[in-house]
Amino acid sequence: MTQKTILNDTHRALGAKMVDFGGWDMPIHYGSQLDEHHQVRRDAGMFDVSHMTVVDLHGARVREFLRYLLANSVDKLKVSGKALYTCMLNPQGGVIDDLIVYYMTEDFFRLVVNAATREKDLQWIGEQAARFDVRVEERSDFAMIAVQGPSARTKVIDLLDPADTAAASKLGRFAALQTRSRDGIELFLARTGYTGEDGFEIVLPQQAAVAFWNALLAQGVKPAGLGARDTLRLEAGMNLYGQDMDDGVTPYEAGLAWTIALDEGRDFIGRSVLESQKAQGAPRQLIGVVMDEKGVLRHGQTVLTANGEGEILSGTFSPTLGKAIAFARVPAGSIEQLRVDIRGKQVPLRAVKFPFVRDGQAQPGVLGD
């Protein structure tokens, strides 16, 4: 049965076109995906991300547990509210999910995991947590709203309790704080996002979500759907689980080497596979590609390289760049003379460094200059 977020009726009242996304009835756009994309790049837009799963972990050994569970090191988290992006791996080094972990207290950490992987994540985390005496609590009582764009933080801070605005203004990237709105709504405010823009992801009680969404609307924050969220994250070079990586792909093959911490004396699930892959080199790599000819790059298209075939993973027409862009997984070392097979025609591709877009602007080399 399709699940609905607490904001479902609100989306429909705003004229949203709804689609099934990982078993959830979600807005794809509210009229124009293109306008919503530009709104986030130029001002501020908001997304209902209440389908994401918040998992609270409690116990005296929770840090020890996360040192074992995650490929990145929670030992980097020393200040309450600090966040870390990481992969959770299987024993073969494959990515079960990518997630954000927040350090709350020494016996309380919070995870935010993907919606489509909820069941397998909860099962895996629960199985691994048992021997560490860690209590796993899914917070289905929460909703989540992401407000993103150059003006996003200002518009959100204007809605906070005046006693909290100074702390919220000083909040660094990849950090969170517990705060409240002017109306007394408890908010977990995280300076994170999935668009490449600045902003906040806000976790709040479900019963307060509609009122807070409407307060953001009154601030001039425009709603944006999953369509714009996808083109924004793609321009920003951010992976989508299930499309750009899965449990048969290691972080080294997903462009996520930077999330692996091979710190001494820490044994984490999948570590031995990653160590040997680092020493020998991963057989495949994830790259960004741009197509200068007209057309659209789509998932599953074959990429031809001097070292063998690869494939397009996420692909779209970039509204900011005016060109087709994509992630591709290709044999290691293949970044020259790339071509994509589009209905039997071989079209040239250029490999570029991530991200395609930063702070609303094309990154050097992306446009071919």
From Swiss-Prot:
Gene3D superfamilies: Aminomethyltransferase beta-barrel domains, Aminomethyltransferase fragment, Probable tRNA modification gtpase trme, domain 1. GO terms for biological process: glycine decarboxylation via glycine cleavage system. InterPro entries: GCS_T (IPR006223), GCS_T_bac (IPR022903), GCST_C (IPR013977), GCV_T_N (IPR006222), GcvT/YgfZ/DmdA (IPR028896), GcvT/YgfZ_C (IPR029043), TrmE/GcvT_dom1 (IPR027266). Pfam families: GCV_T (PF01571), GCV_T_C (PF08669). One of its GO terms (cellular component) is glycine cleavage complex. SUPFAM superfamilies: Aminomethyltransferase beta-barrel domain, Folate-binding domain. It catalyses: N(6)-[(R)-S(8)-aminomethyldihydrolipoyl]-L-lysyl-[protein] + (6S)-5,6,7,8-tetrahydrofolate = N(6)-[(R)-dihydrolipoyl]-L-lysyl-[protein] + (6R)-5,10-methylene-5,6,7,8-tetrahydrofolate + NH4(+). Disulfide bonds: none annotated. The glycine cleavage system catalyzes the degradation of glycine. The glycine cleavage system is composed of four proteins: P, T, L and H. HAMAP family: GcvT. Belongs to the GcvT family. This is Aminomethyltransferase. The gene is gcvT.
